[in-house]
């Protein structure tokens, strides 16, 4: 039998070919990865993030954002100083240097005081070369006042609006409020602050700082929203709520202002506005809405099962639109709260569906001293939530709440569901 012979040269060539192909594959993979990274970086630099937010407090940027702004050298600073010196002094209605410790102003002739500090509060990104346009329509109130509201003056809000086309930035400056009513009866003053919401999205809710013991607060705070297309501004509205801070209870609502942006032209420069603060309209609905709940008492385990099912016909909390409701459930024993639960928040709806179940342990077999409180609240990010309506079920509860509780006690181990009208919280 002849011996089998193989060529060693063929086996030596195989590793060489594999190595060459591996090297080419590695180079191709690295090149592809580098190209993808470059494409992502260039796309990210060219894309403007929508609704980026910057807050400026009296000319100081407390939420800085790097927007690839170039550094200014000595020559640029000098030229900018000369340009600002060449600008004429603008006559304004108040003098910031004449404020007292509470932020109040002396009663003087409005034409006598002048200051340029009030207008020069925008960031350096916005050169003040545009003309300031004051629209005659902006000096009118956003809502016609009734005879009752005219008798009860709630003050005036001063603000300015501006749009920067280069940065696609919408700038709102809350300047001051004058003539606010006193919410503290002892000191005859208020601790005011302002909340602002952009409608109809309600995604951006901002607020100013609290100014202590003043009825004429000067906030001078600038809120800048980046990535807002100019045509989109015509579809928006600004809702301002003027409140007085209360350390021990819910903040007092002084009033509100609604500024629709449709028809307002910001292409000519900054626009100054004054709006009368009107009373918050709480009579937008005939009632506070209804709540559907189901309860079951288990006598063998001394537990109470509570199911929050639905809510309907919930009123608007204010002119900012629909509420963001959720339900808070409190269990009381002898007028002492022993347990609490809450549902998830349902966004922008007057008819919410919850379908959430909670189980409470009852400390004793008798239900005479047990009561269940349902609070329907409007979720407000960054501030205290407002109570839309309230419902109480218990032995001493009035109306449908007492009847529902009696059925629960008479028929244990049975899930009993009923609709209830909500009352004021």
From Swiss-Prot:
SMART domains: C2. Residues 1-16 are vesicular. Residues 105-119 have a biased composition (Polar residues). Residues 137-146 have a biased composition (Low complexity). Residues 153-274, 287-420 form the C2 domain. Residues 38-425 are cytoplasmic. Synaptotagmin family member which does not bind Ca(2+). Involved in neuronal dense core vesicles (DCVs) mobility through its interaction with KIF1A. Upon increased neuronal activity, phosphorylation by MAPK8/JNK1 destabilizes the interaction with KIF1A and captures DCVs to synapses. Plays a role in dendrite formation by melanocytes. This is Synaptotagmin-4. It comes from Rattus norvegicus (Rat). The lineage of its organism: Eukaryota, Metazoa, Chordata, Craniata, Vertebrata.
């Amino acid at each position: 039998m002849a011996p089998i012979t193989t060529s060693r040269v063929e086996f030596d060539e195989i590793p060489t070919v594999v190595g060459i192909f591996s090297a080419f594959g590695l180079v191709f993979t690295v090149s592809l990865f580098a190209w993808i990274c470059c494409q992502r970086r260039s796309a990210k630099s060219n894309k403007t993030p929508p609704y980026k937010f910057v807050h400026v407090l009296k000319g100081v940027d407390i939420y800085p954002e790097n927007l690839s702004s170039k550094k200014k050298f000595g020559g640029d600073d000098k030229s900018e100083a000369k340009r600002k010196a060449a600008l004429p002094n603008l006559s304004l209605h108040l003098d910031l240097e004449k404020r007292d410790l509470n932020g109040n102003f002396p009663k003087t002739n409005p034409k006598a005081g002048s200051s340029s500090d009030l207008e020069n509060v925008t960031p350096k990104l916005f050169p003040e070369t545009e003309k300031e346009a004051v629209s005659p329509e902006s000096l009118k109130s956003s809502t016609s006042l009734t005879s009752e509201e005219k008798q009860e003056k709630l003050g005036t809000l001063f603000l300015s609006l501006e749009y920067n086309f280069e940065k696609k930035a919408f700038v709102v400056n809350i300047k001051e409020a004058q003539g606010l009513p006193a919410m503290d009866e002892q000191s005859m003053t208020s601790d005011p602050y302002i909340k602002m919401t952009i409608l109809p999205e309600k995604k951006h809710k901002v607020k100013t700082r609290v100014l202590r013991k003043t009825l004429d607060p000067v906030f001078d705070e600038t809120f800048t929203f980046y990535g807002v297309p100019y045509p989109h501004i015509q579809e928006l509205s600004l809702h301002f709520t003027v409140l007085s801070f209360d350390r021990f209870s819910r903040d007092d609502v002084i009033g509100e202002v609604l500024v629709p942006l449709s028809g307002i032209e910001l292409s000519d420069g900054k626009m100054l506005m004054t709006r009368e603060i009107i009373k918050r309209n709480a009579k937008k609905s005939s009632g506070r809405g209804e709540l559907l709940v189901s309860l079951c008492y288990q006598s063998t385990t001394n537990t109470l099962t509570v199911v929050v099912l639905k809510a309907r016909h919930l009123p608007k909390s204010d002119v900012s639109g629909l509420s963001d409701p959720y339900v808070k459930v409190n269990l009381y024993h002898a007028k002492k709260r022993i347990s609490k639960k809450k549902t998830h928040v349902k966004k922008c709806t007057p008819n919410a569906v919850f379908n959430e179940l909670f189980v409470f342990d009852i400390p004793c077999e008798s239900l005479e001293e047990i009561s269940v409180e349902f609070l329907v609240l409007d979720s407000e990010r960054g501030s205290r939530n407002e109570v839309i309506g309230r419902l109480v079920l218990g032995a001493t509860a009035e109306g449908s709440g007492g009847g529902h509780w009696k059925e629960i006690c008479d028929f244990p181990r049975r899930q009993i569901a009923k609709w209830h009208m909500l009352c004021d919280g």
